[in-house]
């Protein structure tokens, strides 16, 4: 999700306040007053289309419930839901990152997820308010050109990237919201003032190598146009698959355990309070963290980590159980507003 799209969420939240004074809908996985045996669920999805389509197909086959998917950037969809308020046609909202869901939850637009569904994933990867569930995860990593840098030369901390030694060698894609959790983590650990100075430093070091998206960033690192950048893990794996192993001149590596640059990003889903198909929406949420959908995530080329039902990580990824990220929580990541404000102040948005 682009930073401009998340800003739309925050702007839309002002207008949404007047639209969310609606009665709560009590739902269970067994049914509800807003259900139909022939219902067609409307899914607003900001997740990878390939993964979502595979999961939807499996859900339809298993349940007989049809799903109509509207695919777009999660920021665009979140802003639209806020504008639509209680009249939104969406039944379920699925995202790549937690801040978009937190924004909707903060305005009372999501209903509670069934306890039995939430129990399928660790509580730390789902909404503190229990109104959305964690479905999959990614981890922020270093990507570096292996012809120009040895692994032993890599920074141990994301803070080191502001040092003069990386001037002209660093790549950034600051408008990608995958970068914002790192900014939030830096601010949470070191304070906003130091986070601002760090952003000024990396902006200076990345001058001439600031890209519009992570795909461009990882491509430029791989081609040797720039030495190092910070991305979510799956961008490197997808580049490897795209260009073929013989043309890979880069690698991914983690920051030191617990570093603010070593962050878990959670992709999740929630059901809308305004859904006219409450029971079916809850069934879909349960399916997302059940074994069938989680195995699809584990084997899919999106290279994400499954979070539910004890499904193991895909073979190419560092095992999820061995990751040692910054302890920042989804609650602390919030709506992403802290990161957005800092990035704006640093002229990176």
Describe every region a protein language model picked out.
Residues 1-40, 349:
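Short, low-complexity disordered leader/linker segments with a strong preference
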Residues 28, 35-103, 349:
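Early extracytoplasmic/lumenal segment of secretory-pathway proteins
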Residues 46-53, 72, 76, 88-226, ...:
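Extracytoplasmic ligand-binding site segments that recognize negatively charged/polar headgroups
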Residues 55, 194-198, 267, 276-288, ...:
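Short amphipathic alpha-helical coupling segments at ligand-binding clamshell hinges
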Residues 141-148, 264-277, 296:
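A bilobed periplasmic-binding-protein/Venus flytrap-type ligand-binding module shared by bacterial periplasmic
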Residues 168-174, 287-311:
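Periplasmic-binding protein-like
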Residues 193-194, 306-349:
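An extracytoplasmic/periplasmic, membrane-proximal ligand-sensing/linker region
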Residues 211-274, 309-316:
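Extracytoplasmic/periplasmic substrate-binding proteins
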């Amino acid at each position: 999700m682009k930073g401009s799209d998340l800003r739309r969420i925050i702007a839309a939240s002002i207008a949404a306040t007047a639209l969310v004074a609606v009665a709560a809908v009590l739902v269970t996985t067994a049914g509800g007053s807003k259900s139909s045996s022939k219902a067609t669920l409307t899914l607003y999805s900001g997740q990878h289309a390939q993964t979502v389509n595979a999961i939807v197909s499996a859900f339809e086959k298993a349940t007989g419930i049809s799903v109509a998917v509207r695919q777009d950037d999660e920021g665009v969809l979140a802003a639209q839901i806020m504008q639509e308020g209680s009249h939104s046609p969406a039944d379920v909202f699925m995202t790549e990152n937690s801040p978009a869901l937190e924004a909707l939850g903060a305005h009372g637009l999501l209903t509670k997820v069934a306890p039995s569904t939430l129990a399928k994933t660790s509580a730390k990867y789902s909404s503190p308010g229990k109104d959305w569930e964690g479905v999959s995860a990614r981890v922020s990593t270093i990507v570096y050109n292996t012809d120009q840098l040895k692994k032993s030369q890599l920074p141990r901390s994301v803070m080191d990237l502001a040092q003069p030694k990386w001037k002209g060698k660093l790549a950034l894609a600051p408008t990608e919201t995958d970068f914002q959790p790192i900014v939030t983590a830096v601010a949470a650990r070191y304070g906003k003032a130091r986070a601002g100075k760090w952003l000024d430093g990396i902006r200076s070091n990345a001058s001439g190598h600031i890209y519009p998206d992570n795909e461009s960033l990882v491509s430029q690192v791989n081609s040797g146009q720039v030495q190092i950048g910070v991305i979510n893990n799956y961008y490197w794996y997808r580049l490897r698959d795209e260009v073929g192993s013989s043309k890979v001149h880069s690698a991914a590596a983690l920051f030191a355990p617990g570093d603010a640059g070593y962050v878990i990003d959670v992709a999740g889903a929630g059901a809308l309070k305004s859904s006219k198909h409450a029971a079916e929406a809850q069934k879909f949420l349960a399916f997302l963290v059940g074994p069938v959908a989680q195995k699809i995530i584990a084997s899919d080329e999106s290279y994400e980590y499954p979070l539910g039902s004890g499904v193991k990580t895909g073979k190419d990824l560092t095992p999820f159980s061995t990751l040692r990220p910054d302890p920042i929580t989804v609650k602390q990541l919030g709506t992403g507003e802290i990161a957005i404000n800092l990035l704006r102040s640093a002229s990176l948005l």
